[in-house]
Design a protein with these regions (language model features):
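Conserved N-terminal structural module of periplasmic/extracytoplasmic solute-binding proteins
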Residues: 11-15, 26-125, 138-141, 365, ...
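A local structural motif
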Residues: 60-62, 86-95, 113, 183-192, ...
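Glycine-centered hinge/linker elements that transmit conformational signals in sensory
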Residues: 204-205, 248-290
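C-terminal capping/gating helix-and-loop segments adjacent to ligand/active sites or protein-protein/ligand interfaces
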Residues: 350, 393-395, 399, 412-471
Length: 476
């Protein structure tokens, strides 16, 4: 199995990226009632026509997409409705609750009407679901993939196709930051000066002491640690110190042997930023076990916080919060600084995590209908418009021109960061994390730590031990 995500290639796609036209389905109905015999004949004709229509619809197939991201459910529902109205092909979108995708997929895939399109999160996901992944090497959508090395491959087959290049970091409200820079004796006077952890920490702690003056409840939005709501920390944040560990030790991420164990040598750096989040927040650490991602994003949107860790996909959440006070031009990104040597040249975390797969156990007509739907989504004018404006994706396909890029501020700022001279993006290495169980256990440990019932040394040991245990479990 091969999965090669190279930052240079991802950056190239980010810089060059920004949906066959819809088929109109029409039907006419003619009714006539004269004699009883004619009526009977008409009824027979109608019955035959209905049967023929049903048979034709069955041959055309149907689509059942099991979506991974709750924040994009509304967009996918609208896209599905648009496609069905245009083509007559039924498209059902079901969205798993946050943090439950693996369990939901396991349950749904066993049903008679199983998902025809599902998602995996990289090589580890493929290892779990390869028996259900159809070979897409001959598909039109794979042909349009700008960088074929981004796909999930096994031998000569292609089993997972990436559909978006995304980025995450610390999102900040520039209006609040500008207000802070004008206070008495600020620890920095511009965002350009905040390019390492030491400066970030000084600024954040000073802002927290001036929270009332700045009109905020805390510098950072609440660190959501409710079960299923902790992925920003046990996956995205943990990626940063492990990225440096793999890089510094020249670990071959494509080698199973090379990633059997980790040292977690940058544990202190993880603690640096995690403690900064916890201690300068809207919510006290002991209460974080009930906080959701939506709660956290709402705090930012309502101007209660100045910063929040999340990705470019989060702008849809921010902009739709009732009472939102943050102007689009004030929503910007900065890297997640942790105190690593040379981090002044570190950029955002940019990569791809989720891949479309077609269920090879589904009826052939449903597999075809599902591929047709994805092809429409990423090649037709209507589909591409939905990808850009509704989903906000930067798509890795050659069907998108330079002008077909999301216009929301976070996508635009992500593109700007990826093109900065002398700045290196952090790769998404969490696609090789051992399992969802590993992530869940790390998340639970982080909550226990936040509540003061676990030491950081214990957290670090758990990360190392759980990594080794889950790598061994998934290999067996």
């Amino acid at each position: 199995m091969k999965m090669n995500i190279l930052l240079k290639r991802v950056s190239a796609i980010v810089l060059t990226a920004a949906m066959v036209a819809g088929i109109t389905a029409c039907a006419t109905t003619t009714t006539a009632t004269t004699t009883a015999a004619e009526a009977t004949g008409a009824a027979v004709t109608t019955a035959k026509a209905t049967t023929a229509d049903t048979t034709a619809a069955a041959k055309a197939g149907k689509v059942y997409f099991l979506n991974f991201k709750p924040e994009q459910d509304a967009a996918y529902q609208a896209i599905a409705k648009q496609y069905t109205e245009s083509t007559g092909i039924p498209v059902t979108v079901v969205t798993a609750a946050s943090g439950t995708y693996e369990q939901t997929l396991m349950s749904e895939i066993a049903k008679t009407d199983a998902p025809t399109i599902f998602q995996i999160n990289g090589p580890v996901g493929y290892a779990s679901w390869k028996d259900y992944c159809a070979d897409l090497s001959g598909s039109e959508i794979y042909g349009h993939l700008t960088d074929k090395s981004l796909a999930i491959t096994d031998g000569t087959g292609v089993y997972g196709i990436p559909f978006a290049i995304e980025g995450y970091g610390i999102i900040y409200n520039n209006a609040i930051m500008t207000k802070y820079f004008a206070t008495t004796a600020p620890k920095a006077t511009s965002m350009d000066q905040i390019n390492n952890f030491a400066t970030l920490k000084a600024v954040v702690e000073d802002m927290q002491s001036k929270a009332k003056e700045l009109g905020i409840k805390g510098v950072f939005s609440s660190t959501s640690l409710a079960s299923g709501e902790d992925w920003r920390w046990q996956t995205h944040l943990l990626n940063v110190p492990l990225y440096y560990e793999f890089k510094d030790n020249k670990i071959d991420l494509g080698s199973a042997d090379g990633t059997k164990t980790i040292k977690f040598q940058n544990s202190a750096n993880f603690q640096n930023i995690f403690d900064l989040y916890l201690n300068n927040s809207v919510t006290k650490p002991a209460l974080l076990g009930t906080v959701s991602v939506n709660d956290s994003m709402a705090e930012f949107a309502l101007g209660q916080s100045a910063m929040v860790q999340n990705g470019n996909w989060a702008y849809g959440q921010i902009s739709t919060v009732a009472g939102n006070t943050v102007k689009p031009e004030d929503v910007k990104f900065m890297p997640i600084y942790t105190g690593m040597t040379g981090e002044e040249s570190q950029g955002l975390c940019i990569g791809t995590e989720n891949y479309f797969c077609i269920n090879n156990k589904a009826p052939a007509e449903d597999q075809k209908a599902s591929l047709d739907f994805l092809t429409w989504l990423y090649t037709s004018a209507e589909g591409k418009a939905a990808v850009v404006s509704q989903l906000g994706f930067i798509a890795p396909f050659d069907t998108f021109s330079d002008t077909e890029k999301p216009t929301d501020p976070l996508a635009q700022d992500m593109l700007a960061w990826s093109s900065k001279t002398g700045i290196t993006s952090v790769a998404w290495n969490f696609t090789i994390f051992p399992s969802q169980t590993f992530k869940d256990n790390v998340g639970a440990a982080l909550l226990t730590y936040a509540q003061g019932q676990m030491t950081w040394d214990e957290v670090s040991k758990l990360v190392v031990d759980q990594w080794a245990a889950e790598k061994a479990n998934t290999a067996s």
